[in-house]
C-alpha cells in the first residue's frame, strides 16, 4: 500500500490541477445545485447540441447536458438519474442528428462517464463504482494533458463559460480560420458519416423509443430537434440515412402525443456562414439565434 501512496497522491494533485481549468461541467453542476428546484427544461445531445442551445436565451430556467461524443445511452442515464432533482421539469429536448441512429452507443467505460460521475453523481458505468472512477485525468490522459498545457503554459483555447455552462467565446474554428469565405469553405472536405449500420440502427431506434416512452410515462413534454447544418454538410449526406431517420421520427411523433419535432437541419435561410463554427456546429452567435427561435417555438 505504501508503494502506491505516492502514485495516488500524484493523481490527486493532477486532478486538482484539472479542476482549476474552466469547464462547462463545473458551471452546469453548480447551476443544477442552486436552480434544480426551478429548472423546467433540459437538453440532451452531442457537441452539436452543446453548441446550439444557450439557456441564457430561454424564458424558462433550463440546463443543457449536451456534450461532445455523447450518445442517447448516456443522455438517458443522465435524465433518469437527475430527474428527481428537477421536481418542476416539464420539457426535455433531445437531439437526433443526421446519423445518430447509425452510430453505436458508447461503451460502459466511455470516458465521459467519469465526468458525469464526478460532477453530477450520475453513474453510467452500469456497475459498482470505485475511487478511480472519479479521477478525471486517467479517464482520458491525452485530452487532459492538452488541457493542462493550454491552461497553465500556452494560455490558449481557454473557454469562457456563463452561469449555465455555455461557452460564450466559442467563435473560433474552421470557418473562422477560412475567414468565412464561402468559396474557400466549399472546397474543403466535410466530416460526415455516410455509412449505414443496420445493426446499430435497429438497436438505437428501439432504445430511443424507450426514452420517448419514459418521457410519456413521466408526463414530460418531449421536443426532438434536428439542428442547423451548413450547406456543405447538407449536400454530402447519404439520402438513405436521412430518410430512415426522418421516417422514424415521424412515426414516433404520430404515436406519442407528448412528442413534438423542431427540425431546422435544412434551414439555410435563417442561418448563414457567420453562424457556424464548422459545417456541423453553430458558433456562439448562431446559438443565440437558434436558442431564441427555439424559445419562441417552446412558448407556443
Describe the residue ranges of each PLM region.
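Hydrophobic membrane-insertion alpha-helices, especially the h-region
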Residues: 1-18
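Alpha-helical transmembrane signal-anchor/signal-peptide segments
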Residues: 17-37
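Structural motif
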Residues: 40-42, 91, 221-223
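Short hydrophobic beta-strand that contains or immediately precedes a catalytic carboxylate
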Residues: 41-45, 276
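Membrane-embedded segments
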Residues: 48-136
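Secreted/periplasmic serine-hydrolase-like ester/acetyl group-modifying domain
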Residues: 105, 109-218
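Active-site segments of SGNH/GDSL-like serine hydrolases
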Residues: 212-238
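Long, positively charged, glycine-interspersed low-complexity recognition regions
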Residues: 239-300
